[in-house]
Amino acid sequence: MTDSLTLLRPDDWHIHLRDGTALETTVPHAAASFARAIIMPNLVPPVTNAEEALAYRARIEAQIPAETPFEPLMVLYLTNNTTPETIAAAKAAGVVACKLYPAGATTNSASGVTDIQHIYPALEEMERQGVLLLLHGEVTDSAIDIFDREAVFIERTLRKVVADFPKLKIVLEHITTQQAAEFVAQAPDNVAATITAHHLLYNRNHMLAGGIRPHYYCLPILKRQTHQQALVAAATSGSPKFFLGTDSAPHAKSRKEAACGCAGSYTAFAAIELYAEAFEDAGALDRLEGFASHFGPDFYGLPRNSDTITLRREPWSVPDTLTFGDESLVPVKAGETLNWRVQK
């Protein structure tokens, strides 16, 4: 049994940092272990153009701790009104990707796309410009069961987009089902997926059996154990199509522990440690570096990081709460023990 693991410094290819005073917590947490992060644009109002992306990046950069190299990679939020000109301007400003949220699919997605045909001209420009398409892969049809919405999205929307845009790099984010893992594995090389730590560690029993545990509630929702096992198999397979994206999504404790609680699990405080636990449980610690540090930059066409981090087996207790602006935040594994810790 190994007690130490050194990795090329990883990146987070999907994170929510929020805005305002929340950045005082989320940015240092992300920057502690990751060199780069793909920053989700679902603010209120959302980040829909180059000017807003640059302003948001500046607010993030203002919270990066001194002597800490961390690069926020900015993303535009696609709407029915996103134009090819908007895409071209974003590319020129350094934006690397655009995010498709089906309207109403998740937190702050009301401005999202109602019909993907509306954004085909924007997708064509993204394909030309080399801007990636990031997908929240769920339908929002109220007639579709919440546990089936990812699988239906693949059949109803994703297959056609992949066929229509063969040169567009597409990331199906935070996959949660066996169907998604199988689709991505069999798709052309321009299609990849991110997988969260919490979807590797948990299934819907953790959220629902013996009482409702709101801090496991996220979207796409945790699925049954067979899907969790398929995700673990994909993440630990060594396939370059699957890489790290935490989807760390903070909400104040009062907004989670409520009659109508918000969706999102907070993992950025110890993300790589949580992944290490999942990979160790699967007997695949030797596959963690590829998943966390190699395959994401390779897919994005960016260089791998050159520095390293070291994880040590050092059990520690996760705090019950963390500071979150003027409120508190309950992290994943609050009050429990994590067995790995990044050496400072």
Swiss-Prot record:
GO cellular component labels: cytosol
Keyword Signal in record: no
Domain of life per record: Bacteria
One Pfam family here: Amidohydro_1
Any GO BP annotation: 'de novo' UMP biosynthetic process
Gene3D superfamilies membership: Metal-dependent hydrolases
Keyword field contains Signal: no
Gene Ontology molecular function terms on file: dihydroorotase activity; zinc ion binding
Residues where N6-carboxylysine is found: 99
Subunit structure: Homodimer.
Name the UniProt record assigns to this protein: Dihydroorotase
Organism: Teredinibacter turnerae (strain ATCC 39867 / T7901)
Gene this chain is encoded by: pyrC
